[in-house]
Design a protein with these regions (language model features):
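Domain-level signal for soluble alpha/beta catalytic cores
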Residues: 1-377
Length: 377
């Protein structure tokens, strides 16, 4: 019996969520930033582009639809800025990637954090209304530990002082973030959302043993931050409805076709794969930077793994036979029925996007679909 069609995520031919912004969206956002386009005009441009994107996702045969993150500047910061008690600030520098620095923004705690009236709920309702038969609208948001990590950094003047004026301890901060996420998750569920994805780059940092060594972090320190990440993410998930699927995507950075960190999953697998209460892990495996499949032996029984074997960082199409072979290699550690396929990340984690064309983007999606049909027909 075919297992190609799934009732909810993960899907055999899946995506991470973001897509290249069309020029009309880029132009509208630039005009809005310049003060020559009002909020209504910006929303109209985004709405039109998202409708077109959803049509293309349907035409590609995807079971999942997203808004491509067209209403965001970043995959993570816009969500943080939408929480009560967190504000947008310019950082001293951008995030440092290999050969490139990102735009310079961060998130600063300025008051008690809560999740009421988050703008992403309205964003989701727009996509939900576009669902077709057998399709599921997905909402992607940064993982709770990602928000914790961002606001506890020292990326702009006064960031730490502002945080500690509100939350004296990390424990108080973590509790507040978890509660805020539970509010947003409940509101998304009430809006009809049945698939939420936590995007999480914190684990990519801990995979990079060279970077960790430079920070002076000890094995005990690594264990503590890993346990904190799992505990905070689980606290946000706690009490979710049974029919709400929450998955997570682990990334090593995806900005303008470059990356921030490298290293296999070995350091984090005993914590993340074994203990996080998500339904599935969306994992990068597109280059040797992500290591081998052996850490998948730590995946808890019954959990699902989406193999990110097709890169979004380059236009060249992967060899289908080679990808099929790698899927079967992964099946040595996770049963084939619990494996799925997707690109390694989104196509535009930030609005600048990766270095490929829209046609090349859709060719990647078509490749994922063809391979999934071969493996799970």
């Amino acid at each position: 019996m075919s297992t190609l069609i799934q009732p909810n995520a993960p899907f055999r031919a899946d995506i991470v969520g973001s897509f290249l912004r069309p020029q009309a969206v880029k132009d509208a956002r630039a005009a809005y930033a310049a003060g020559t386009l009002d909020t209504a005009g910006l929303k109209a441009a985004e709405d039109e582009a998202i409708r077109d994107l959803v049509d293309k996702q349907k035409a590609a045969g995807l079971q999942v639809i997203t808004d491509g993150e067209f209403r965001r500047s970043y995959w993570h910061l816009d969500f943080m800025w939408g929480l009560n008690g967190i504000e947008r600030r310019t950082s001293r520098t951008g995030y440092m990637f290999h050969d490139e620095e990102t735009t310079a923004d961060t998130a600063v705690v300025t008051g008690p954090i809560s999740g009421e009236n988050h703008p992403f709920v309205e964003h989701f309702k727009f996509v939900k209304a576009l669902e077709g038969k057998g399709q599921v609208a997905r909402q992607t948001i940064p993982a709770p530990i990602q928000t914790f990590s961002e606001v506890t950094l020292d990326r702009c003047d006064g960031q730490q002082e502002s945080l500690r004026a509100v939350y004296k301890t990390d424990e108080e901060l973590a509790d507040a973030i978890a509660a805020a996420y539970r509010t947003v998750i409940a509101d998304l569920y009430a809006a009809g959302c049945r698939n939420i994805q936590f995007d999480d780059c914190t684990w990519g940092i801990y995979c990079d043993t060279d970077f960790v060594a430079k920070t002076g972090m000890s094995p005990v320190d690594l264990q503590k931050v890993s346990e904190l990440g799992v505990a905070l993410n689980n606290a946000a998930i706690e009490g979710k409805p049974d029919d709400l699927v929450i998955n997570t995507h682990v990334c090593r950075g995806n900005y303008h076709s470059t990356y921030a960190f490298e290293g296999g999953y070995d350091p984090i697998a005993p914590y993340l794969f074994a203990n996080e209460d998500v339904d599935a892990f969306y994992l990068e495996f597109d280059t040797p930077r992500a290591g081998g499949f052996e850490p998948l032996k730590h995946v808890a029984p019954g959990k699902k793994v989406v193999l990110g074997l097709v890169t979004t960082k380059a236009a060249e199409l992967e060899d289908e036979d080679a990808i099929v072979e790698r899927i079967h290699e992964a099946a040595k550690y996770v049963p084939l029925e619990n494996l799925y396929l997707s690109p390694q990340c989104g196509f535009a984690s930030c609005e600048i996007g990766n270095k490929l064309t829209e046609d090349e983007q859709w060719a990647k999606i078509a490749l994922v679909k063809r391979i999934a049909e071969r493996v799970w027909k």
